[in-house]
């Protein structure tokens, strides 16, 4: 499926800068102005500027958006670059990795900037920067840094992108100031677009809706697959809310703030799924990037409403048995009209299994 790369990059740039612009500037500023050399072997401690920006980074660390080694003052600094900025998608952490796992070698102070999941579709579009092959996702990062007047490379820090694709030999890819020519058009596969849609829904379910914080009664990660349906438009969600609450009174809970329909009271591994979520990424990105024919293809039986729109992802849980396995599947208005998405739960009202 062909897409205009400038439109793709611009949309994701606007999304990220609108919601995270001040935070991004603050992270770059703190990394730039923290002088690690003032921490080591200084009887009077660090200077006031370094202490102030360390405090900012520690605040980001409490929100899981930065990493600082615990023994900074005792570290021997053997080279100039011990600080970094890392751009990454949040789904990388949901699979079980920690921020420490994403650190470039030798880095002891790092700030993390999270980009939209759908932006990583560009990971599979390679471009040449000098004699090195890089994912087109770096174009988005460079555009963000330039528009916010942030330097990607400083005298004591570097910027990296944690790329999920294995096509570039390593996950951590250095983002330099070097210019390169973006291709005007890029070919994206329907499968890649659907996979990133599922990851985007996964992040929304885990971080914003926080649906995994309280699992259904009787749920066991080792035995049960948690199923979530994603819908692309508000009207479809409203239809499902109205019909299911009317059909099974007392069996559903609708959160109209987070736009999610929960099933409550029972749980069975044989149920089709356990929640319905409005995927906002469709309206904010995909709906603008493609023409109507492409949108029909993407949302039809060969795309999100078919096998390409069904994925199993994991969430690192607090259960002793390990991670929660989650299956994501998308439905469109046509699918809802043709069949009832929820199974009949009448026989299960007496308890859970």
Swiss-Prot record:
Residues spanning the membrane: none
Protein name: Suppressor of RNA-mediated gene silencing
One Gene Ontology biological process: symbiont-mediated suppression of host innate immune response
Function: Suppressor of RNA-mediated gene silencing, also known as post-transcriptional gene silencing (PTGS), a mechanism of plant viral defense that limits the accumulation of viral RNAs.
Family statement drawn from the similarity comment of this UniProt entry: Belongs to the phytoreovirus non-structural protein 10 family.
Entry keyword Hydrolase: no
Domain of life: Viruses
Keyword check for Flavoprotein: no
Gene source species: Rice dwarf virus (isolate O)
One Pfam family linked to the record: Phytoreo_Pns
Keywords: Host-virus interaction, Inhibition of host innate immune response by virus, Suppressor of RNA silencing, Viral immunoevasion
Database matches in InterPro entries: Phytoreo_Pns
């Amino acid at each position: 499926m062909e897409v205009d790369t400038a439109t793709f990059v611009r949309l994701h740039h606007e999304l990220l800068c609108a919601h995270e612009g001040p935070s991004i500037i603050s992270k770059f500023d703190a990394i730039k102005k923290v002088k690690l050399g003032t921490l080591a072997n200084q009887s009077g401690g660090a200077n006031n500027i370094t202490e102030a920006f360390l405090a900012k980074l520690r605040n980001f660390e409490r929100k899981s958006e930065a990493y600082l080694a615990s023994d900074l003052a005792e570290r021997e600094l053997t080279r100039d670059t011990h600080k970094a900025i890392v751009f990454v998608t949040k789904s990388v952490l949901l699979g079980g990795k920690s921020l420490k796992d994403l650190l470039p070698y030798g880095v002891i102070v790092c700030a993390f900037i999270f980009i939209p999941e759908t932006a990583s579709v560009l990971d599979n579009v390679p471009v040449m920067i000098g004699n090195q092959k890089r994912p087109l996702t770096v174009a988005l990062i460079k555009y963000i840094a330039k528009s916010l007047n942030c330097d990607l490379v400083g005298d004591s820090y570097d910027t990296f992108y944690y790329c999920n694709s294995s096509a570039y030999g390593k996950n951590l890819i250095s983002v330099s100031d070097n210019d390169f020519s973006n291709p005007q058009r890029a070919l994206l596969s329907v499968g890649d677009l659907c996979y990133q849609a599922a990851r985007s829904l996964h992040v929304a379910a885990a971080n914003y809706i926080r649906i995994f914080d309280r699992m259904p009664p009787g749920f066991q990660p080792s035995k049960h697959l948690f199923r979530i349906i994603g819908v692309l438009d508000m009207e479809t969600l409203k239809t499902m809310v109205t019909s299911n609450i009317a059909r099974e009174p007392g069996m559903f809970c609708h959160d109209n703030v987070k736009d999610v329909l929960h099933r409550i009271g029972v749980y069975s591994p044989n149920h089709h799924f356990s929640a319905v979520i409005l995927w906002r990424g469709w309206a904010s990105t995909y709906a603008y990037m493609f023409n109507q024919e492409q949108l029909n293809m993407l949302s039809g039986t060969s795309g999100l409403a078919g096998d390409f729109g069904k994925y199993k992802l994991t969430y690192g849980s607090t259960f002793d048995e390990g991670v929660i396995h989650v299956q994501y599947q998308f439905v469109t208005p046509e699918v809802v009209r043709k069949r009832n998405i929820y199974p009949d739960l009448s026989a299960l009202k007496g308890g859970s299994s």
